[in-house]
Amino acid sequence: MCSDFEEETSIQKFKRRLKEEPLIPLGCAATCYALYRAYRSGKAKDSVEMNRMFRARIYAQFFTLLAVVAGGMYYKTERKQRREFEKKVEERKAQEKRDAWLRELEARDKEDKGWKERHAAVSVTAKKETEGAVDKNVNQAPTEEVVEKRGTGILDAVKALVQGKKD
């Protein structure tokens, strides 16, 4: 199945088209050659040869156009199959892109759920901590809170030593 969906590079496509319709590049080359010869004749001031080469250019372009039309009619079914093949390749690419997008969305969804769970757990823990801290402070006097917030300075340490000796 993978071999059905292999894509061709531009060089492979050019070679395939050259093998399918070799008359078109031949007609283009003949047209270019006729134009080159007409240019050279114009530089040489040979108007008869120049007119002859312009007519040859017209014939070469007619040959190229005829090759394009005949090749189009001859390869009509093959081109239709190739379009269907290219359509399948595009559908496969679109499906792969869609699947990758869905996988990315699922990964982000899992990440978001994990983050929400962690955030909820942290919130519950923080709420319990604040409730526990409020319960401990209910039985304490307001002056003790102030002492705790100030911290222990030198004077506080001396007072604690003096009070400790009295007890």
UniProtKB/Swiss-Prot annotation:
The UniProt keyword set, sorted, is: Coiled coil, Membrane, Mitochondrion, Transmembrane, Transmembrane helix
Q: Name one GO cellular component term.
A: mitochondrial membrane
Report the residue ranges that make up the HIG1 domain in this protein: 1-86
One short Pfam name that applies is HIG_1_N
Q: Where in the cell is it found?
A: Mitochondrion membrane
Q: How does it sit in the membrane?
A: Multi-pass membrane protein
Q: Which residues form a coiled coil?
A: 75-107
TM regions (residue ranges): 21-38, 53-75
GO BP, sorted A to Z: mitochondrial respirasome assembly
Q: Which domain of life is it from?
A: Eukaryota
**InterPro entries per the UniProt record, alphabetical:** Hypoxia_induced_domain, RCF1
Subunit info? Associates with the respiratory chain complex III/complex IV supercomplex.
- Which family does the record claim for this protein? Belongs to the RCF1 family.
Q: What does this protein do?
A: Cytochrome c oxidase subunit which plays a role in assembly of respiratory supercomplexes.
Listed PANTHER family: HIG1 DOMAIN FAMILY MEMBER 1A (PTHR12297:SF3), HYPOXIA-INDUCBILE GENE 1 HIG1 -RELATED (PTHR12297)
Q: What is this protein called?
A: Respiratory supercomplex factor 1-A, mitochondrial
Q: Which organism is it from?
A: Talaromyces marneffei (strain ATCC 18224 / CBS 334.59 / QM 7333) (Penicillium marneffei)
The UniProt gene name for this protein comes to rcf1-A
